[in-house]
């Protein structure tokens, strides 16, 4: 299955409704510290796994998310580009329900993003 692009508000609603879904934030540690991170009531649903210069991304991902290949996994970065790469990478190893949050955490040229859409976040 191809990666599905969805906006942050739709992703948030799907994450809240699906207890088995995960959010994978692929931004850098500096971004997490300086800009903030998404907040979900179920802390186990948010995984912080930087994509940048991480040749072990696949192994790290599999060691953290040892779930069925049909688990819904949402990928987030600043504006939707790196998360799209990560989502495609994971889809190509067999995961069937990969979603790219296309407006990212901070937004892009077209959409506001997680933070500006007033979805839960924290420092």
From Swiss-Prot:
This is Uncharacterized protein RP600. SUPFAM superfamilies: Rhodanese/Cell cycle control phosphatase. InterPro entries: Rhodanese-like_dom (IPR001763), Rhodanese-like_dom_sf (IPR036873), STR4-like (IPR044240). CDD domains: RHOD_1. Gene3D superfamilies: Rhodanese-like domain (3.40.250.10). It comes from the Bacteria. SMART domains: RHOD (SM00450). PANTHER family: RHODANESE-LIKE DOMAIN-CONTAINING PROTEIN 4, CHLOROPLASTIC (PTHR47377:SF1). Residues 17-117 form the Rhodanese domain. Pfam families: Rhodanese.
């Amino acid at each position: 299955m191809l990666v599905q692009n969805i906006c942050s508000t739709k992703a948030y609603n799907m994450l809240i409704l699906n207890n088995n879904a995960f959010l994978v934030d692929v931004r850098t540690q500096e971004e997490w510290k300086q800009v903030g991170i998404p907040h979900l009531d179920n802390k186990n649903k948010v995984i912080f796994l930087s994509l940048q210069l991480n040749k072990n991304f696949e192994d790290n991902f599999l060691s953290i998310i040892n779930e069925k290949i049909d688990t819904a996994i949402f990928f987030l970065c600043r504006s939707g580009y790196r998360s799209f790469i990560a989502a495609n990478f994971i889809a190509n190893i067999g995961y069937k329900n990969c979603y790219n949050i296309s407006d990212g955490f901070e937004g892009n040229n077209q959409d506001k993003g997680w933070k500006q859409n007033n979805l839960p976040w924290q420092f």
